[in-house]
Amino acid sequence: MPFIKAVKSSPYFSRYQTKYRRRREGKTDYYARKRLIAQAKNKYNAPKYRLVVRFSNRFVTCQIVSSRVNGDYVLAHAHSSELPRYGIKWGLANWTAAYATGLLVARRALAKVGLADKYEGVTEPEGEFELTEAIEDGPRPFKVFLDVGLKRTSTGSRVFGAMKGASDGGLFIPHSPNRFPGFDIETEELDDETLRKYIYGGHVAEYMEMLIDDDEERYQKQFSGLIADGIESDQLEDIYAEAYAKIREDPSFQKSGKDAAAFKAESLKHTQRKLTAEERKERFNAKVIEAGRA
């Protein structure tokens, strides 16, 4: 009798255990989270920090986060919407913007814990694979672990751009080069030139030049912001290099200057107010009267 219908009886429902809410919503991988936050049992009051990297359609978010019993605590936060302050006004979600955001959160976190002058990282990145090493007769480097969430860790992914930026910014992030752009699986070697090209927006410049030759209309549409500002492909490297230098000079957070009250009032214009019990009764009575007339 292979076709017996499974009957979910009362014992089934009484023993049923629901999964965590964020697992049901598909937001958290608890298998990975458990391993990211579990601390050694012989350490006390020594938080385990994570570099949390998340992407939206337009921006990149990087945070240095530690977990406690009552929730996660954010030590430092950086958002790619802050990059126009440093001269990067376009493509705030691409690989190079992820690198810049990672660099910004690293410098901001080190400044907060007083290690910015001791661990400067890679001031002039050339695409080489480097890990932050401890200095002699000084404090150890600030150690974090990469938290990619649910993002797929493909070779060349933007999440590793943020990690590379944070590593070059002076944080110690245990990693290998085999997920960076330019890594050859067969020879197991990293092409420094390819990685450097991504750090300074060279892949964007190449794409711009290709569109100029092949599809002028698409170029005008896709790079309208750069065209409006008179930026050409050969200027991108200098723009990104200057932005990295400015981030190192002043990584501090600055408020946007928007009026919070005005912003709230504007957002409430599109929010429907919940009716009171009296208003619901009045609306119901009005509908009954209208239906009786019909």
Curated annotation (Swiss-Prot):
Modified residues (Phosphoserine): 10, 81
Entry GO MF terms: 5S rRNA binding; structural constituent of ribosome
InterPro entries, per database record: Rbsml_uL18_euk, Ribosomal_uL18_C_euk
Intracellular or extracellular location(s): Cytoplasm; Nucleus
Phosphotyrosine, modified sites: 12
GO annotations of cellular component type: cytosolic large ribosomal subunit; nucleus
Principal subcellular localization: cytoplasm
Biological process terms in GO annotation: cytoplasmic translation; ribosomal large subunit assembly
Recorded superkingdom: Eukaryota
Keyword terms, alphabetized: Cytoplasm, Nucleus, Phosphoprotein, Ribonucleoprotein, Ribosomal protein, RNA-binding, rRNA-binding
Chain's role: Component of the ribosome, a large ribonucleoprotein complex responsible for the synthesis of proteins in the cell. The small ribosomal subunit (SSU) binds messenger RNAs (mRNAs) and translates the encoded message by selecting cognate aminoacyl-transfer RNA (tRNA) molecules. The large subunit (LSU) contains the ribosomal catalytic site termed the peptidyl transferase center (PTC), which catalyzes the formation of peptide bonds, thereby polymerizing the amino acids delivered by tRNAs into a polypeptide chain.
HAMAP family, A to Z: Ribosomal_uL18_A (MF_01337_A)
Assigned protein family: Belongs to the universal ribosomal protein uL18 family.
Other noteworthy facts: There are 2 genes for uL18 in S.pombe.
Subunit field text: Component of the large ribosomal subunit (LSU). Mature yeast ribosomes consist of a small (40S) and a large (60S) subunit. The 40S small subunit contains 1 molecule of ribosomal RNA (18S rRNA) and 33 different proteins (encoded by 57 genes). The large 60S subunit contains 3 rRNA molecules (25S, 5.8S and 5S rRNA) and 46 different proteins (encoded by 81 genes). Component of a hexameric 5S RNP precursor complex, composed of 5S RNA, rrs1, rpf2, rpl5a/rpl5b, rpl11a/rpl11b and syo1; this complex acts as a precursor for ribosome assembly.
Protein name: Large ribosomal subunit protein uL18A
Annotated gene: rpl501
